[in-house]
Amino acid sequence: MACNKNAEKSRDIRVEYPISHQVDTVDEYFGTAVKDPYRWLEDDRSKETEAWVETQNKTTFDYLSKVPYREELKERLEKLWNYEKIGSPFKEADYTYFYKNNGLQNQYVIYRYKTGEDPSTASIFLDPNTFKEDGTISLGGTSFSKSGNLLAYSISEGGSDWRKIITMDVVTKNIIGDTLVDVKFSGMSWYKDEGFYYSSYDRPKGSVLSAKTDQHKVYYHKLGTSQDDDILVFGGTQSEKHRYIGARVTEDNRFLIISASVSTSGNKLFIKNLDAPQNPIVTILDHTKSDTYVIAKFGDRLYLVTNLNAPYPKIV
């Protein structure tokens, strides 16, 4: 009954919505006129848009502050969420790692212990909650080198898709200094302990929030060198233009597998022989009619999973 009464009270809260002014913008598509009265909001860097966002936020939080059961709801959610959460362990070199959240931490913390020792001896390896006091820097992806002695991890500042990649010596936990910037929609895949492959777009001119980015590229970064010297591996030509490209090195360091797509479904597959880097990249699959990925390699044979002509994916 109390919840119903509180819900009724929240519905009684009056909201004075701010007015969003309209402009006379009209585009014509195939002979049809389409009005776009809020085109001005597409300029996310303008003073007008900034003022509009501030006004909208003020309206929202003014309303939320008056919801009678807000604190009660917050306390209930905190109680439900406040329990220890531990991820599956994984082994790298001499250590076993796992992700853990004590209950209400904003981000999971990476712990580790010497493999073979009691897991209760685990200590903090990397705590994203300490990246910045206000919590606006988060941990993205992580990738250990083949030996397990090096780590590349990405961070996001303020929720941006444009990330930095940081490299670390996992034995000493010291940052190596090979920090890459302006990396977007990328994993990291190590080649031996010498460097790693990653993907990104050219940094757009103007706003990074609204500018178009549609040509993903794969680069190789060699440790100890400048990002300016990174080698463009794939995606630099019009024929190689794709919206999303990912690359990973096989476990034996012999091949680089490249997956390229123009949307969020369907991908092409390519392979590069890392033992003969001068050789051209070979096409495995030249269409995007299916989702096809390499799942294993034994000797010279690749095993793929695909949904091509297979509603339930098959291994080929």
Language-model features: where?
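Beta-propeller folds
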Residues: 3-316
